[in-house]
């Protein structure tokens, strides 16, 4: 994986230069634009500065991460279609949808499922025939955690909802009761959306915490957003989740660089 390697010196120089210039001197200064991604998403000094050492990532950074992952999936889809669409036995690329943080905020306050789907999907996309996964950030099951990012993934082929958390041990016998309660609540609040998106499937959706993990557990109050980004990258590559704390430190630097250049590597 690319983020397991140390960022190249010139890339480090670019990030550190921008980071130094992003030190905030006033509330107004926080709204100054550091870069614009895809001519659409503006990244402010206040957002970019969160990628500094030992700082917790806020909603603006996590929304930027989701935006970059969606761009990456769109690029893969376009390349796949251009190469394979005329081949015999062609199978369409099963796409992923990466939703912004506001999706989960709206889910937990009970927003009507149909209106919520309409907000995040254009009408032709309501039926998920072309989608395999939907990813969205959630808050960790652990209410005592200050830095609480985790990620959930809806799988429309297997009809499952999986939860990925840097604080969850890979050994299923060590799951705390709070996690079980959280998974029950997750399934309950998502059920109307799942039925709306996939009405032909009326059986039970399985909601579980992913346990095939081979990484060092999160043990601080500022890296959960970076952990979540690492987990998402491995999931997109369909690889076992393996990384250590050094990899997380490198990923924080890499993520800052990718935001500046406006794309994630394939």
Where are these regions (language model features)?
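Active-site nucleophile-adjacent alpha helix/oxyanion-hole segment immediately C-terminal to the catalytic cysteine
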Residues: 2-81, 211-266
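Cysteine protease-like catalytic core of ubiquitin/ubiquitin-like
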Residues: 52, 80, 84-266
């Amino acid at each position: 994986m690319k983020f397991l390697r140390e960022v190249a010196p010139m890339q480090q120089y670019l990030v550190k230069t921008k980071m130094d210039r992003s030190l905030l001197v006033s509330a107004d200064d926080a709204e100054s634009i550091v870069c614009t991604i895809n001519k659409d998403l503006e990244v402010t000094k206040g957002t970019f500065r969160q990628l500094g050492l030992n700082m917790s990532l806020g909603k603006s950074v996590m929304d930027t991460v989701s935006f970059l992952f969606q761009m990456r999936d769109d690029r893969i889809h376009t390349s796949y279609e251009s190469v394979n669409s005329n081949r015999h036995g062609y199978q369409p690329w099963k796409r992923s949808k990466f939703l912004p943080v506001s999706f989960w905020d709206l889910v937990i306050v009970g927003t009507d499922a149909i209106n919520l789907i309409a907000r995040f999907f254009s009408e032709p996309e309501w039926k998920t025939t072309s989608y395999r996964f939907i990813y969205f950030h959630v808050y960790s099951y652990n209410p005592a955690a200050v830095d609480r990012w985790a990620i959930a993934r809806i799988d429309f082929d297997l009809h499952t909802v999986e939860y990925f958390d840097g604080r969850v041990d890979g050994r299923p016998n060590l799951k705390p009761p709070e996690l079980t309660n959280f998974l029950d609540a997750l399934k309950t609040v998502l059920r109307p959306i799942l039925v709306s998106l996939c009405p032909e499937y009326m059986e039970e959706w399985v909601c579980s915490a992913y346990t095939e993990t081979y990484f060092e557990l999160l043990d601080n109050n500022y890296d959960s957003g970076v952990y979540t980004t690492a987990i998402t990258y491995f999931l997109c590559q369909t690889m076992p989740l393996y990384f250590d704390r050094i990899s997380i430190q490198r990923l924080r630097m890499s993520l800052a660089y990718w935001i500046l250049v406006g794309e994630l590597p394939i």
